[in-house]
């Protein structure tokens, strides 16, 4: 559960309505894989991830990034039940994929950076603060199965 004020919820949903999920998702996952290269081990089937340009131009990275942000978008519709919303994904990432839950936090922080880059002055400190709460809540929900 994420505790957001009415103003914070409005800020999050207003900005999210302008997000190009495909573009932002691909860039977010791509940046995660470049900045934190150890995360690439979960994506060995994606082909060439040898350079930053290879990662950022990789169609499988872009497609999976879109999928990740589509799930995040679903979470924004259920901020009061993130654990329930992400229960199956938490189980998958814990039991089958064995993803370090810290990676969820890293991904959330990269998403905030990408949103800041895309929205510039519109991504005010207040909007960032609200998004930091949301990505922390999503990361905690995804890590829930690990506890």
Swiss-Prot record:
Which one GO biological process term can you cite for this protein?
hydrogen peroxide catabolic process
Q: What is this protein called?
A: Hemoglobin subunit beta
Where on the chain is S-nitrosocysteine found, per UniProt? 94
Q: In which tissues is it expressed?
A: Red blood cells.
Residue positions where Phosphothreonine is found in the record: 13
Q: Which residues carry this modification: N6-acetyllysine?
A: 60, 83, 145
Q: Write out the similarity annotation.
A: Belongs to the globin family.
> What organism, scientifically named, is this protein from?
Lepus europaeus (European hare)
What GO cellular component is one of the record's annotations? blood microparticle
